[in-house]
Amino acid sequence: MEIECHAKVNLTLDVLGRRPDGYHEIRSVMVPVSLHDRLVLEPAEEEIVLESRPPATDRLEENLAYRAAALLREATGCSRGAVIRLQKTIPVAAGLAGGSTDAAGVLTGLNRLWGTGLSDGELADLAIRLGSDVPFFIWSRPARVEGIGERVTPLPVAGPLWMVVATPDVPKSTGQVYRWFDELADVGPRPDAGAMEAALARGDAAAVGRALCNVFEQVMLPRHPEIARLKEAMLAAGALGAVMSGAGPSVLGVVPDREAGGRLLERIRPLSRDAWVVRTLV
């Protein structure tokens, strides 16, 4: 069984507050994009085997794809094994949810391969135990994501959008980004999720560009001017709008079409470690 595990970008991201349990309430408009990892699942007797290229840098028990397989087996009582072959393209710790999408692909794929029969809702209940972005990928379509990531509401969209996604060479810890945000005395501009959802429903790329907003930029851009320079370069080169995705450091720039994306890509390539022209999935 072969599965494409797609990256996501956040068109809007707002942090509404910190809960007593330490988790943060968020509201985000998220879309999957054509950039993807490739996952191959094969049945095995009992053992769960993970093969990743390039090789995974974390310990096996900490790898999200492996943890997803182990969690599904534990939750369903299944005793079967699997060989998980993962070809990585999405950069790690980049604000594109590369680990989360792989975990969701393992959950949905092994649910079919093993015949465990869980519904999408039941898979999403397992997914939130792996990470806040994982439930979104059970459906992997444009959505409003709320709570700690467990509330996923699909959104109507008129069609695909084109954009350039670029990742500068900036180290990042998502936990640290949240801690910096908690220290803000005053949060600046917040996203208008309603405006973004309306723009997506109309297929209005220019309006999508105007509505892009991520509150994490307020703590990341001052500390990492490379991200700010990349965003400014996208806007100067003609992007309809640009914003950091997730907790960064990746930046997306909305463009009118694929050709404009190719031109923008060449302009900003020197400022990024990785960059792609992508379209959103609907």
From Swiss-Prot:
The keyword Protease does not apply. One of its GO terms (molecular function) is 4-(cytidine 5'-diphospho)-2-C-methyl-D-erythritol kinase activity. It catalyses: 4-CDP-2-C-methyl-D-erythritol + ATP = 4-CDP-2-C-methyl-D-erythritol 2-phosphate + ADP + H(+). It comes from the Bacteria. Pathway: Isoprenoid biosynthesis; isopentenyl diphosphate biosynthesis via DXP pathway; isopentenyl diphosphate from 1-deoxy-D-xylulose 5-phosphate: step 3/6. It holds the Pfam family GHMP_kinases_N. It is an enzyme of class 2 (transferase). The active site is at residues 8, 133. InterPro entries: GHMP_kinase_C_dom, GHMP_kinase_C_sf, GHMP_kinase_N_dom, IspE, Ribosomal_Su5_D2-typ_SF, Ribsml_uS5_D2-typ_fold_subgr. One of its GO terms (biological process) is isopentenyl diphosphate biosynthetic process, methylerythritol 4-phosphate pathway. Keywords: ATP-binding, Isoprene biosynthesis, Kinase, Nucleotide-binding, Transferase. The keyword Kinase applies. Its EC number is 2.7.1.148. ATP binds at residues 91-101. Catalyzes the phosphorylation of the position 2 hydroxy group of 4-diphosphocytidyl-2C-methyl-D-erythritol. Belongs to the GHMP kinase family. IspE subfamily. PANTHER family: 4-DIPHOSPHOCYTIDYL-2-C-METHYL-D-ERYTHRITOL KINASE, CHLOROPLASTIC. NCBIfam families: ispE. This is 4-diphosphocytidyl-2-C-methyl-D-erythritol kinase. It comes from Symbiobacterium thermophilum (strain DSM 24528 / JCM 14929 / IAM 14863 / T).
